[in-house]
A protein has these predicted regions:
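Intrinsically disordered, low-complexity, mixed-charge
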Residues: 1-101
């Protein structure tokens, strides 16, 4: 008998403020790779935008994604002026969390 699949969500967040040139993307990747519970991993990516914003997409269980985004918001609060969230389609087979250029 196969195990039931856990629910998976994907959230995109566009951050504005002083979010480029301050280690924002590296901190997001570090949180995803080391702070989040390895039994409930986060996948996705983070990248700089031409207008000075940073876009992040995070995928995983609802609890993992919300915990990850909370950690990002707390650790980088001094840099974030606004964060606009949107639900996205789940990317099947995605592995890892990376920095896109």
């Amino acid at each position: 008998m196969s195990m039931p699949r856990r629910p998976v969500i994907r959230i995109q967040v566009r951050y504005s403020g002083r979010v480029q040139g301050v280690g924002f993307r590296a901190t997001c990747a570090w949180i995803a790779q080391t702070v989040v519970d390895s039994a409930d991993p986060i996948t996705g990516w983070v990248r700089n935008e031409a207008d000075g914003d940073v876009t992040l997409e995070a995928q995983g269980s609802p609890a993992a994604v919300e915990g990850f985004l909370k950690e990002v918001g707390e650790r980088l609060a001094r840099n974030i002026v606004s964060a606009v969230r949107a639900g996205m389609a789940v990317v099947e087979g995605e592995r890892g969390f990376g920095i896109r250029r």
